[in-house]
Structure formats: C-alpha cells, structure tokens
Amino acid sequence: MAAAPRHLLLCATRKAAAALSELVEAWRSASVRVELEYFTGATPDVAALVGEHDTLDAALLVSWARRAPGTVLPAPLVRRRDGARVPIAWLPFRDTASLHRFAATAARVQRRAGNRRAVALLGQWLPNYLRVSDRMRWLAHEGGVRAFRWTGDAITRESMIDALGCGLGLGLYVGHGRPMGWVGYHGVRAHHFHEPEPGIARRSTREPMGAILSLCCRTASRKRVGMSYAESLPLLGVAAASFGAVGDTLHSDNTRWAVGVCSALAAGASTVGELLVRAAPASPTALESYRLIGDPLAPLGTDERSLRRAQRVRTYA
C-alpha cells in the first residue's frame, strides 16, 4: 500500500488538543509531522490556512459543537498554494469524554499493522442500490480488493452492525440517508452501535473501522438533530473517520463516488484522505455536498485477524 501523508495541520483549542494527545502521539509514531494551530476565539478558516501551505497533506479542525459540518468547512478537499488538493476534516467538540473516545479509536486504527485491502459493501434493499453494490464488488475483485457484500437483502441490521465490529479498513453505504442515519436495514441510527437489541448476542470485542463512507443524502446534516449521524460515528468509536453529505445528493454523483472509491482503493490509496483525493468526481456539486469527519489520515489497511472475522460473517445471499 502507498505511504501515508506525512504533514498534518491540527487546528484546535488547547483543551481539545490535550484531549487528542493519544492520537497526536500515534500520528507522530507513524512519522506524521503534526503542526498545531491553537485558537481561543472564532473558529479559524481552515481552507485559507491550507491555501498558505505548499507541503501540507491533510488538516483537521476541532471546534465547538454548535458549529455544523455544512457551515464550518466548504468541502472535503481544498487546494493548497501549489494547486494540489488536500483533505480537510471536521470534529465537533461536545465534551472531553467523546474526544478522548475518538482519539483512542483513531490511535488504535493508526497503530494497526494491516496491509490487506478490504471493503464492506453496505446498501439499502432496492434494485438501483444493489446494482451499484454489485458493480463495486466487481471493481473491487478486478483490483484485488476483498469485498464483503453486507447489503440489506443479505444481512439483518443487527448482524450488519455486529459485522462492522470486525475492524475492516473501509465500509461504503449506498442508499437513502437522513441526518439521523441510514434508511436501509429498516433504519440505522448511531445508538444502534452501542445499544444492542434485546435477546440478540453481539461480539464481545468490537474493532473500529478505518472509515465509513455514506454515499447518500444528508447524513452529515444537522437539520432537526443535535449531532448528525456522520459526526456521531467517530465520536462513538465506531470508526476513525466518516464521510457524509450535508444536503441532498444525486444518485449519479454518488455512483461516481462509489466507482471512484473502489478504483482508488484498488490503485493503492492507503488513507481515507488519499482515497477521497483520488476518487473525487469532476462535478463540483458532487464534491461540495460532502464533508469528512474525524481523522483525515485514517489508514484503510485491514489486518489478517479482522479479515478472518469478516469471512465468518453469515449472510443470506
């Protein structure tokens, strides 16, 4: 797999940066140069800061949770001074406990020694989304990527949530979405990941995913919710990073994203930020609709243990 980016800009208050110390240490252990930009008043314009750099590979803004993904960042990618595109991510500071949980999760993913390429294909049980999932599975197979098809026709919600605890590097959902979660699987909400349904056993140890991409409408929107689904996943420790839309999206744009993501993973993209840079469609609306949440350098490699756990997941198809 390709080498990870090596220069990260972290914009945060001193209190937030202190809560992320475990992740900062993990970045530095992975030879990432972490540049800290502290602020105390207004949230800085991260896109402008990135535009002043020539060598920056990624940026993460951590600011107060009263800000929303759709207004605090303009897009998941911005250009630095030399014209190269750089992934920028957002993380809401709601409380130190959730930041500590995120930092521990992202640090764990950073320290994993996974070098296998694998993806969990998730999707709503509707023909157009199942066709996209089948196309992604074919692209993954052609590119030497192990694809696990855990779509709504093949697995129940509770089994899918349990399967995502195997620790694969990447999960990719296609279907309808809402600010509170996925419409597929009879509705998936953030609380389902830590509140198992009565009478259903769940694996005792969950391993976080590298990144979960929701290629659908509004999962990063704050409309009528205190915290969007895309923001909740990293804060709950489900994944080191997530990717979701702040508004409505076009099925054609989401399909282009899906195809691009599978092609980029097959071509060797090793972090979620690198994946998005390689996979981004040419359409400005396809890019500007989405936001990256969490660690922009989250590794996408899967280790052998996680791969074996995923292979044991039972499906109906």
Predicted features and spans:
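Short beta->alpha junction loops
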Residues: 35-41, 147-155, 246-247
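Extracellular/periplasmic Venus flytrap/periplasmic-binding protein
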Residues: 126-166
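Loop/turn elements at helix/coil->beta-strand transitions in domains of secreted/extracellular proteins
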Residues: 5-6, 44, 114-119, 143-145, ...
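Structured catalytic cores of large enzymes
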Residues: 2-6, 23-143
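Structural motif
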Residues: 10-15, 50-53, 63, 121-127, ...
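Catalytic cores of nucleophile-dependent amide-cleaving enzymes
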Residues: 66-112, 174, 179-257
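Active-site-proximal C-terminal subdomain of hydrolase catalytic domains
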Residues: 215, 219-317
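Short, highly selective alpha-helical patches that border small-molecule cofactor pockets
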Residues: 16-25, 129-137, 226, 230, ...
